[in-house]
Amino acid sequence: MTNTPRELSRIYHRRFIRTAEYRGKVWQILTSGFFSRWILPEFTVLDLGCGYGEFINNIAARKKYAMDLNPDVPEFLAQDVELFHQDCSAPWPLQDNTLDAVFSSNFFEHLPDKEAVNRTLREAQRCLKPGGRLIALGPNIKYLHGEYWDFYDHHVYLTEASLGEAMEIEGYQIEEIIPRFLPFTMVKAPEYPMILVKLYIALPWLWWLKGRQFLIVAAKPRA
């Protein structure tokens, strides 16, 4: 079942509005201190299921696109971000080979079924330039068990292995897989000082203690 735009508005507001400022600060650190290794300032980037724009507002890129169905998203996006207000598994309004990177955070598990996941992977690959990357961050059900279903709009259960396999089936080349990266959610977690967030990112051994989200970096083949 796909959530309607009105339902998404209610879900986002209930779940994220209270921590919006904190989330923005965390993503400033994540984008500049970690994800910038794959996304250069001259890149054209699309944020898939962008939410309130925490990633796309903070990443340094020449051209920024965002895609989401939530009708509230425009009020949260920076002025340099162009929004596609649509179902991410429907055809994208972009030409082939136009994107350097597609990023998604906690998105694929919200799609209604695995066929929608496949359609989205195909559209991302079509729009990526040869050598362009799909960077996917998401909850790893392997390490979550029942907590995965605490969010009403989680429909598709994924691990780093299953989503990585889906990417390979669609023709991507896996460059990096991190089974445990970030903690599960900021929704119910304490708001830690930013110095601790920076420390966590800098010490990968902490990921294996606290991380319950996977990170996958996959590339569109160059030939």
Language model segments and positions:
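Helix-to-beta-strand junctions that scaffold the AdoMet/dcAdoMet cofactor pocket
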Residues: 40, 111-112, 128-130
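A C-terminal cap/extension of S-adenosyl-L-methionine-dependent methyltransferases
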Residues: 165, 176-223
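A short glycine-rich, Lys/Arg-flanked "PGG" loop and its adjoining helix->strand segment in the class I
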Residues: 118-130
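Conserved beta-strand signature within the Rossmann-like core of class I S-adenosyl-L-methionine
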Residues: 131-138
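Short "lid" loop at the C-terminus of a central beta-strand within the Rossmann-like core
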Residues: 139-144, 180-183
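A short SAM/SAH-binding and catalytic strip from SAM-dependent methyltransferases
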Residues: 101-115
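Conserved N-terminal segment of class I S-adenosyl-L-methionine
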Residues: 1-95, 101-105, 121
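Acceptor-substrate binding/catalytic loop of class I
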Residues: 147-165
